[in-house]
C-alpha cells in the first residue's frame, strides 16, 4: 500500500482560497436568509498578534461559523483599533511616521489572521485611524 503524505499547509491554503473566491466570508445585503451580526474585539495595532488575541477571537469565530452552518447570513466584520499614544510612541522610537507604522502593523495582523483561518468578512474591514471611518465617529459626537 502506498503511503500518503499530507501537507496541512497546502490543504489549508487551497480551501481558504476557494472559500474566499466563493464569498463564504461575505454577507450580502440582498440575501433572504435570517441575518446575524457578530463582532469581536478589534485588536490594537501595536505589533504582531499574540495568543491573547486569538484567545479572545476564537469563540467569536466559532460562533460565526456555527451560525453560517445553521443557514444564517452572517455579518462578521473585523477591524483594527489604531488610535493611541502607544502606537505613536512606538513609531517615534522606530523613526517611522505613526500612520505608516500603524498601517504596516494592520497589514501584518491581517495576514496573520488570514493565516490562522479566521473567517472575518474582509470586505467590511475597518481601521479606526482611517479618515473614512473616524469621520462617522466625529459626526456622531457632533450630533449628541
Features from the language model and the residues they span:
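N-terminal, positively charged nucleic-acid-binding surface of large information/translation enzymes
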Residues: 1-144
Amino acid at each position: 500500500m502506498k503511503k500518503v503524505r499530507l501537507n496541512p499547509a497546502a490543504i489549508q491554503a487551497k480551501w481558504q482560497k476557494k472559500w474566499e473566491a466563493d464569498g463564504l466570508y461575505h454577507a450580502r445585503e440582498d440575501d433572504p436568509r435570517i441575518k446575524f451580526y457578530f463582532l469581536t474585539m478589534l485588536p490594537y495595532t501595536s505589533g504582531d498578534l499574540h495568543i491573547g488575541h486569538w484567545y479572545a477571537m476564537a469563540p467569536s469565530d466559532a460562533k460565526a461559523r456555527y451560525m453560517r452552518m445553521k443557514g444564517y447570513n452572517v455579518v462578521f466584520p473585523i477591524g483594527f483599533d489604531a488610535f493611541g499614544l502607544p502606537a505613536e510612541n512606538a513609531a517615534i522610537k522606530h523613526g517611522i511616521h505613526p500612520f505608516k507604522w500603524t498601517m504596516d502593523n494592520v497589514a501584518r495582523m491581517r495576514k496573520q489572521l488570514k493565516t490562522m483561518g479566521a473567517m472575518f468578512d474582509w470586505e467590511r474591514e475597518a481601521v479606526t485611524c482611517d479618515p473614512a471611518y473616524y469621520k462617522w465617529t466625529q459626526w456622531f459626537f457632533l450630533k449628541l
